[in-house]
Amino acid sequence: MFEGFMVNTWIVASIVAVIAGLVGFFVVLRGSAFVAHAVPSGAFAGAAGATLVGTSTLLGLGVFSVLGAIGIGWLGRRGRHDVATALALAFMLALGALFLSMTGEYAPEIDSLLFGEVLGISTTELLPTLALAAACVMAIAVLYRPLMLSSVLSEVAAARGIDVARIEVGFLLVVALATTMTVPVVGALLIFSLMIGPPAAARSFTSRPA
């Protein structure tokens, strides 16, 4: 239970639980559950592309998570947000399929991104996870007040001079950071559940946003 790899597992699992709950609170509050599904699922294209060029899958995952978040934010300004999210997801999944077909070989590290590898976290992988978690917490702390207001009353936030569109993009980037740190641990399928399930259950006990 307290062997080296299990200690890493306990630490990383605890960090993932905190970050998923923190980011998921705003995901549920903003009604952006589809985004929490699209960014992790579509980011596997980055891992596939990284495998194709022979670089770190974590780097590829992070790049495509950020690009996907920016794409959703950019398209969302020009039309319905759910349609923009669906288009970004379809595009990233198509790229992922293309990259996988170009590799011409089985890539187990890509498949593991669907379900995660919580027992396979090494000490060297622990440090990037801690850094990304700290970045998520700092970003939420900086954006907290305008993000909270724009999530609850976007018209009031805009009337007070808050750039709602910029806050939206900033929050999408936070989701991208959370995706980059959590998907290798618990997988793209489970992180969606962790971001949505507990915050949605918590909201059923109170009508107050915070």
Which functions belong to the PLM regions below?
Residues M1-V18:
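Membrane-interfacial amphipathic/re-entrant helices at transmembrane-helix boundaries
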Residues G4-N8, V53-T57, R77-H81, S112, ...:
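Juxtamembrane/transmembrane-helix boundary motifs in multi-pass membrane proteins
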Residues M6-N8, R78, T85-L143, G170, ...:
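Transmembrane helix-bundle core of multi-pass membrane transporters
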Residues V12-V16, G60-L61, T124:
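Alpha-helical transmembrane segments of multi-pass integral membrane proteins
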Residues A13, A17-G21, A47, V66-I70, ...:
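Hydrophobic core segments of alpha-helical transmembrane domains in multi-pass membrane transport
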Residues V16, E125-P198:
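Helix-loop-helix "hairpin" substructures at the membrane interface of multi-pass membrane proteins
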Residues V18, L22, P40-F44, V66-L67, ...:
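Hydrophobic alpha-helical segments embedded in the membrane of multi-pass proteins
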Residues F25-Y106, A202-A210:
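Short loop segments and helix-boundary regions at transmembrane helix junctions
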